[in-house]
């Protein structure tokens, strides 16, 4: 057949139709008057034999077709090129779990972030309540058209306010009744309220400071604020999604992120957003001359050091329609073009679950508290405050 095709190429009609000009399949069919011979010519004419490169992996078989190929996968494998084991999770596959994936003996299973439920295909995730995490309303997050007002914050961004009404730190709404912030911020004042983007103020009835927080070193500088009543979704705000470390490392961190936080403009805290990309620990450590631990992460963004950031800002990443929290800004970054060092929130996923799922045992907030090193907080009056110990169990 090969020699026959070669001879035909130099016959006037086929040479004119298919080599001097681009021909269509029907024109070649008129020359050969035979489907099998036409198909063999057409595969060569349209790019040769794709199966020659052995694109089907894991012992899959390949069948050439016009302008392409088709793989038949061996048992236990699937995907266009048979690259995916049916029992394993593969972050790069487009037809896999929309949110979280768990490998199994025969097949993987999917689950969804808070407020989402599995679709009929058992892979997609659909918001099913008003407080579904990581969703953005139509009002988010640009300036009102024709207005010079401040940029609207993400719906999970909140401010921390003291008893005198002064905003002093930022925080992140991770559930309708829990705000994540730094332990340092949570210890600054005894009386704390949370102010949402709609200027609703919610009293903090208790605080959970990580039991391994070290004020001197800044290790484990995280705290959860337990709100006296939940945020009214979606008007007052929406929580961001949280993720485990494996999902964050393999799926989220390779993607670009957004640092959404608060910066100082005079005495006012105004929202600011900055596109960031993940920086590998070794590179970040060299740039900052610091040790990057498993509980910290680095991000790089243009002119990040030019703004006066307030602690409690958050790095979020969008994945298939939902926004996930990957980093918490613990302190103002140094001036200059260097990367930002943040608290790696997914490393605290177990601690977050322990706190949010237990009965409320947080420290009550009086009008007078204990500052760091046990000194009274100036300007506040009333009761006493101390960090809450978590129930026995593993800590991350």
Curated annotation (Swiss-Prot):
Q: Where is the Gla domain?
A: 1-46
Recorded hits in PROSITE patterns, A to Z, give: ASX_HYDROXYL, EGF_1, EGF_2, EGF_3, GLA_1, GLA_2, TRYPSIN_DOM
Please list the disulfide bridges: 18-23, 51-62, 56-71, 73-82, 89-101, 97-110, 112-125, 169-185, 284-298
Task: Offer an example of a GO molecular function term for this protein.
Answer: serine-type endopeptidase activity
Supply the Pfam families for this chain.
EGF, FXa_inhibition, Gla, Trypsin
Any idea where the Peptidase S1 domain is? 135-357
- In which compartments does the protein localize? Secreted
SMART domains for the chain:
EGF, EGF_CA, GLA, Tryp_SPc
CDD domains in the record = EGF_CA
Residue positions, PTM (3R)-3-hydroxyaspartate: 64
**Transcription regulation among keywords:** no
Listed GO CC annotations: extracellular space
Sorted alphabetically, which keywords does the UniProt record give? Answer: Blood coagulation, Calcium, Disulfide bond, EGF-like domain, Gamma-carboxyglutamic acid, Glycoprotein, Hemostasis, Hydroxylation, Repeat, Secreted, Serine protease homolog
Residues that carry a glycan: 53, 59, 191, 289, 388
Q: Where is this region: Disordered?
A: 356-396
A single GO BP annotation from the record? proteolysis
Q: Let me know which tissues express this protein, per UniProt.
A: Plasma.
Top-level division of the source organism's lineage: Eukaryota
Domain (EGF-like) spans: 47-83, 85-126
Q: Which SUPFAM superfamilies match?
A: EGF/Laminin, GLA-domain, Trypsin-like serine proteases
Name the residue ranges with Basic and acidic residues bias: 364-375
Q: Which family does it belong to?
A: Belongs to the peptidase S1 family.
What is the purpose of this protein?
Answer: Inhibits activity of the coagulation protease factor Xa in the presence of SERPINA10, calcium and phospholipids. Appears to assist hemostasis by binding thrombin and promoting its association with phospholipid vesicles.
- Name of the protein: Vitamin K-dependent protein Z
Which gene is this protein's source? PROZ
